[in-house]
Amino acid sequence: CSRIHIRKLNGTREIFKMNYDTPTPDIRLYPAALLGKRYAVSCDINQFFPSIYTHALDWALIEKDQAKKNAQGKICQWSHDIDRFSQLCTNRQTHGLLIGPHASNLLSEIILARVDEALLMKNADYRFLHHIDDYTCYTESYEEAERFILDITEALRAYDLSLNEKKTSIAKLPTTLSTDWVRRLQLLRPQSKTIRLNDVVHYFDEAIGMTLELDNNCAIILYAMKVLAKLTEHMEYRAKLYYFEMSTHLLFLHPYLIPHAEQQVFQRGMNLLDITSFIPILYSQAIGQRDNLTCAYSCYFAAKYNGTLPSTLCDDALRSDDCLFKLFAYWFFKKKNDAGGVKALYDDALALSQNAEDFDSNWLFVYEALNVNDLDGKWKALK
C-alpha cells in the first residue's frame, strides 16, 4: 500500500503532507508487515517522474486495450483529457510529469495503484509499502524476496517504468525503520531549554560530517537546518547568529537548499541587512555557474526583501533564455520601478508571443509580462 494518503487537509490547500520530523500514523503499519518475515526488499523506481508516460495514465484508468481505442476520448473522455492535459504541462511531451506539484503525486498514484494491484494478484501474501517511488517488501525467504523483484519489474514494465538496479537490495531482518543518519541526528538534537552556541556548532558539525560520509547527501544538511530552525526561539544570541551565518554559508555551497532558504532561515528572525547582503553574493555565484533557478530565486528574494542586484541583471536574464529567470527579473524590475528593465523584458515577451512554440515554452513569463490586449483567445480572457 501507499504511504501517500491523498486527502483534504484542514487549514491548507495541500492534499498530503511529507514530514520527516514527526512519525505519521503510517508507521504503525510496520510491525504488522514485519510479523513472520525474515527479509526486507528495497526498490526504487528509476527516474520516476521524468519517466512517466502520459498515455500510461489512460492505460491505468481504463485498461491498456481500451486506452488504445480511446483516441480523441471516444471511449472515456475524462481519462483522455488527463493524458492530454498532462502533456500540456510539459510542452506537449508525452514523457515526464512535473516534479513538485501535488497534482503530479496524485497522477503518479493512479499508475502505482495499478502496480500495487498487479503485485497482489501475483501474490496476495506480499506485504509491502511504497512512499512515492520507494518500495519496501517484507518476505519470509530470500527466494520470495527475489520473486518480488521480478514481479515488480514486470508490473512496472507494463507502464514503461523500470527499477533502479543500483538502489535495489535485499537485507536480512531485523533492520532499522529510520535511515541511519536520521536516527543519529534525532539522538543529537539539542534538548536544553536554552540552546547555546556549542549546541548549534556541534549539531551542524555532525550533520556536515555525515553529509561528507554519504557522498554529499544534502538531504542531511536540510534535515539539520529544519530541526534547528524550529529551535531558533530558544537559542541564545550567539547561537542564533551562528545558525544564520552557517545556514547562509551552506545555502551558498549547496543550491539544492535554496528553495528552503526563506522558510528555514530568512523567516526565523534573520537580520534584514544580512539577508540583503547575501542576495547579490548568491546571484553572482549562480550567474557564474549558469544556475538559472538560483538566479530566479535571487530575483525573488531581492524583490521581496528590497535587496539589490547587479546592473547586468536584464542582459543576464535575456541571455539565459529561461522562463522563470526572466519572470522573476521582470517582477524585480516592477518592484523597483525600473522602467528600462520592464520595457526590455516586455519586448522579449512580446517577441516570444509571436511564435507558438516559443510561447508554449515561456507561457508563464509571457502571460505575466504582457498586457491584456497583447494576448489572444483564452489567454486574453484569462488575463
Stretch-by-stretch model annotation:
Residues 1-40:
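Active-site-proximal segment of RNA-dependent polymerases
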Residues 31-132, 138-146, 194-383:
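Conserved polymerase palm-domain catalytic core
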Residues 142-198, 202:
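Polymerase palm active-site segment centered on the conserved acidic dipeptide of motif C
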